[in-house]
Amino acid sequence: IQHIITLKSQGKLAQNYQAKFTSTFIPPNGDYQNYGIMAAIDHINALKDLVKRFPKFADLPKIYGGGSYGGYLALLIAKIAPWYVDGVIDNSGTVLPLLECIIGKDLSRPEFFFSDLNKLVGMFIKTYWTREDERLSYFFTNENYMIRSLLNSSHLTIQASVNKNIILVSYHSLKDPFNTAKDKQTLFLAYKELGYDATLHLIKDESEIDGRFIKDLNHGMRITDKALFRKELPLMLEKLQGRKSFMQENSISYPCGNKVFTFKDVENQLKLIIN
């Protein structure tokens, strides 16, 4: 980088020149990016372990929430284990899987960038998924995509048949740079048509920026998780007041192409069975 700065000062490189690199984050402990499914299952199994240790927690409302990927996970949990969900509070969660986070290297599309005046670094996170060779066990099939998608009409119908007594609240910027607002609108319209208590706060323009809760129109709108829950959690708890929340084992199956993904309680764990 110092060499680039020197060449610019000597007039041998254009002042707007950036050296372009890519880099891969490798999580500790052998972890990797599976995108969605494993993390959602882990959340449910953490809930099960918590209730096992503190049985009185079993009757409390089960509310999941977060921003961006965390919001997507909260909505995905409502898909794979709706019987363990009373409410979801989401900020800017995607509706369809972001391929940059799954097969970004195959597509030459980094998940995010670091940059300054002299360099542009495209960042990936370690994953085994690929679309380059379908003989590989980590080939990302259409079925793998379908199960991670929240916007699938047949899956939504199955989800609602198991439990549509879920309150869903979401914030999303109409100008989200990931171009996900239209999909989020379609999803929440489907939720409502299926009988859910679903509210989407679509932030359309600068007039809705208050500088305290909503700070801009970019992805996430700089809404902190703390502010999100401070605003929405009391309202959701009020709606849930008097409702009984149980820990009842169940299962749900989603046909995806030539495969069926079944999420099932087995020996105090939620497990995924693929047939």
Q: Can you name each region flagged by the protein language model?
A:
Residues 1-54:
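Alpha/beta-hydrolase active-site loop
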Residues 70-77:
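Hydrolases whose catalytic domains are alpha/beta-hydrolase-1, hotdog thioesterase
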Residues 115, 121-231, 237-238, 244-275:
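Serine-hydrolase catalytic core
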Residues 47, 51, 77-78, 188:
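A conserved amphipathic alpha-helix that caps or lines the catalytic cleft of carbohydrate-
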Residues 60-61, 86-87, 167, 197:
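Residues at the starts of beta-strands that form the adenosine-phosphate
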Residues 79-142:
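Hydrolase active-site cap/lid region
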Residues 55-68:
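Alpha/beta-hydrolase fold nucleophile elbow
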